[in-house]
Amino acid sequence: MMNIAIFSFTKNGSCLNVRLMDILKQNNILSYTLPKYMIDDRMTALINLKETVEAHFTDDAIIFIGATGIAIRSISPYVKDKFSDPAVMVIDELGRYVIPLLSGHVGGANELAEYIGGAINATPVITTATDINGVFAVDVFAKKYNLIISSRKLAKDVSAALLDKEPVDIDSDIIEIDVSDIKKKLNPTDVKCELRVRITDKIYESNVLTLIPKSIYIGVGCKKDTDAKEMLDFVNEVFISFGIDIRAIKSIGSIDIKKNEKAINELAKSLSVPFLTFSKEELNAVEGEFNESEFVRKTVGVGNVCERAVLIQCKKLILGKIARGGMTIAIGRD
């Protein structure tokens, strides 16, 4: 479900606005128009366009029904980059053309424009180079598989090379993401390429564009009032030493008595991942051989928190407990 704001400014535009509310009804829609054109109870009176657009710039999509100039002037103070901007599009009031303006790929504006165009019998005006040339788009691929793009610059370099019909090598360490057919298209003669793309949660050379899946889960523990920076540095160092990209972390787990531990909460916040906690009963119920500590067992009721917390979150423990300065970590992968 998407959060979508729709703006219209004329009588014809308001009629199309209502049509779009019905077409996109599976989403969370907020519809705005001038007070004199409110023809549906679902509409909200548009009093201040600039303030309303600003309030919706964290939405998934913004649709303007009217002139392109109105849309551009309305959004210009808030535009940042294609990785954070919402999908923004313009539709003329007669519903003839649907024009994506921002976030055609990452934000999904092109895809939404195609969908709306089909629904109202309008022509989507797609201007993205990779789309109109039928070229593999890194950002579209990454979005489809929920992958993190390691370098925006390298992503641009890859797109530019493909548009210039230069070969690019691509491989995947992830069984579920098969790129064999894509590899044949991007590098049909299997030559050594200057530009390489790798779908992986491992750390590669800085000149390789990695597309990183959220495939890693960690379990952690620490003594009370551990310094937050010390905790983050510890986790960073462990990941670097074992060649795992820290951006691949999907969630962090620990025992429930640590739910308010500042160091772990700050770690989760800095990595933008959820912090999950489990009771001692849940942790003790996990089967397997673990690096147990009698001191920890007497203190919290579980002989090993981090390894057990990993295996509640995922299937496989790939790195057993590592301890330093009252902190522990274990790592798993789906």
Q: Which role fits each region the language model picked out?
A:
Residues 9-30, 37-38, 43-48, 52-110, ...:
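Conserved mixed alpha/beta catalytic, RNA-binding, or beta-rich assembly cores of soluble enzyme
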Residues 1-6:
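Extreme N-terminal starter segment of soluble prokaryotic enzymes
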Residues 236, 253-308, 314-317, 321-327:
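C-terminal non-catalytic interaction/assembly regions of soluble proteins
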Residues 30-32, 125, 274-278:
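General small-molecule cofactor/ligand-binding pocket signal
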